[in-house]
Amino acid sequence: MSHELTLQEIDQFRSDFDNSRNQVVSRAAMRSGVLEASFNPAVTNRLNDVFSVEVETDNVTNQMQSGRCWLFATLNTLRHDFGKKYKAKNFTLSQAYNFFWDKIERANIFYDAIIDSADKPLDDRTVKAYMNFAGADGGQWAMAASLVKKYGVVPTNAMPESFNTNHTAGLSDALARKERKDALVLRKLVQEGKTEEVEKKRKEFLSEIYRMTAIAVGEPPKTFDLEYRDDEKKLHLDKNLTPVEFFNKYWDINFNDYVCLTNAPDHEYGKLYSLPFEDNVNGGIPITFLNVPIEYLKDAAIKQLKDGESVWFGNDVLKEMDRKTGYLDTELYKTDELFDVDTYMTKAERLATGEG
């Protein structure tokens, strides 16, 4: 079907728009923006910071202009456990440390995927998906758990934040461009049957990725001294720890005991779903989600909070979110009322159409 807009139709659109109501809301939207003009103040009456189940929290950490929310959330759950166990409120872990290893591991798994798919054309959907993920920042719980399990953790002072960890676009773009160029080289070598040269080049490329990342964010420490004061001001010192030793010594956690629950009503409940394209560590924990009804997910989260344990969660945070207040609410913006349209869809419909 091909429909060409006519001048008569445009004239009708103008006529339909020409009323006082549209002029009033247009002035408000143009002056304040669509979201401000449609903000629903009624949400403030029911969104407060008083909860029936409270878990003691520490100071908020700030991912700044980076896609590391998944990593911050995982490390926040770990530092909550540390603070609770060792009475050290506001103890923080370095996000920069695990961010470094994420870049190296992602490059490694990217090169493997490119080599394995070298027999497919560049416009193959699988190959294009790999190319799109090159240099990416975003992630899931299993990705952070894989990094912690393999590389451990360090306190913030052992590897502090830097400009390029707070603002990752520059490094991510540089890594993506390099990895895509490397992909062309590796594909050509595989197609020519030069197996030994493939492995040689792969190692060379990984060394270059390491160099780029180290230049941008610094090299991660091999060892460090753990030094902190607990809530009673008592000094604690544990010298010459490796990051893995630190994690194994101070945390009693088995990541395999945890599962990510999701609510995707456009897919069958009671099934385990995976995102193999987003796995970041070869031999790590694969990304999986157990799809359950929303009531089950809610009940599980409440039980975990009642047990005194923080809950990692991920959501489409840019939808119905106000940065100034921190509100997340499906009734936050009355954009349908502003535009006089009906965009309501069920959650299943939103997911199926790419809206969710």
Task: Give the residues covered by each predicted segment.
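Papain-like cysteine protease catalytic cores
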Residues: 94-228, 232
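Active-site-adjacent substructure of cysteine-protease-like catalytic cores
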Residues: 130-134, 168, 172, 177-179, ...
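Extended, H/D-rich, highly charged conserved domains that either
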Residues: 199-304
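N-terminal regions that are enriched for targeting/export leaders
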Residues: 2-58
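Glycine-rich, histidine-containing beta strand-loop boundary motifs that form or position
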Residues: 64, 73, 157-161, 315
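Long, well-ordered hydrophobic secondary-structure segments characteristic of membrane-embedded
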Residues: 35-124, 130-139, 145-146
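Short, glycine/acidic-rich beta->alpha junctions
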Residues: 61, 140, 293, 355
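Generic, well-ordered alpha-helical scaffold segments in large soluble proteins
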Residues: 72, 76, 80-81, 147, ...
